[in-house]
Amino acid sequence: MPGITREEVAHLARLARLELKPEELEHFAGQLDDIIGAVARVSEVADQDVPPTSHPLPLTNVMRPDEVRPSLTPEQALSGAPAQEQQRFKVPQILGEE
């Protein structure tokens, strides 16, 4: 299997909105090759006889019942906010900007 190219790393970086330097492209290309190789080795071992798992140990969620408790009033919650609007925290817009 051919290795990951600098162009492929640059494409992935653009998709992730990352700006990488040329030397970082080389570095990450090597790292991605190592990761893909490790996944390929695991795929070779994984067989129909091996059940898929998401964790090596059995896990169970510990749930507790929801309880309604007193909480902060909107005024108390917003008392330390640098900016607020209509009983909400006002923050700088980040989506939709280029």
UniProtKB/Swiss-Prot annotation:
Its EC number is 6.3.5.-. It catalyses: L-glutamyl-tRNA(Gln) + L-glutamine + ATP + H2O = L-glutaminyl-tRNA(Gln) + L-glutamate + ADP + phosphate + H(+); L-aspartyl-tRNA(Asn) + L-glutamine + ATP + H2O = L-asparaginyl-tRNA(Asn) + L-glutamate + ADP + phosphate + 2 H(+). Pfam families: GatC. GO terms for biological process: glutaminyl-tRNAGln biosynthesis via transamidation; regulation of translational fidelity; translation. Keywords: ATP-binding, Ligase, Nucleotide-binding, Protein biosynthesis. It is an enzyme of class 6 (ligase). Signal peptide: none annotated. InterPro entries: Asp/Glu-ADT_sf_sub_c, GatC. Gene3D superfamilies: Glu-tRNAGln amidotransferase C subunit, N-terminal domain. Residues 47-98 are annotated as: Disordered. GO terms for molecular function: asparaginyl-tRNA synthase (glutamine-hydrolyzing) activity; ATP binding; glutaminyl-tRNA synthase (glutamine-hydrolyzing) activity. Heterotrimer of A, B and C subunits. Belongs to the GatC family. Allows the formation of correctly charged Asn-tRNA(Asn) or Gln-tRNA(Gln) through the transamidation of misacylated Asp-tRNA(Asn) or Glu-tRNA(Gln) in organisms which lack either or both of asparaginyl-tRNA or glutaminyl-tRNA synthetases. The reaction takes place in the presence of glutamine and ATP through an activated phospho-Asp-tRNA(Asn) or phospho-Glu-tRNA(Gln). This is Glutamyl-tRNA(Gln) amidotransferase subunit C. The gene is gatC.
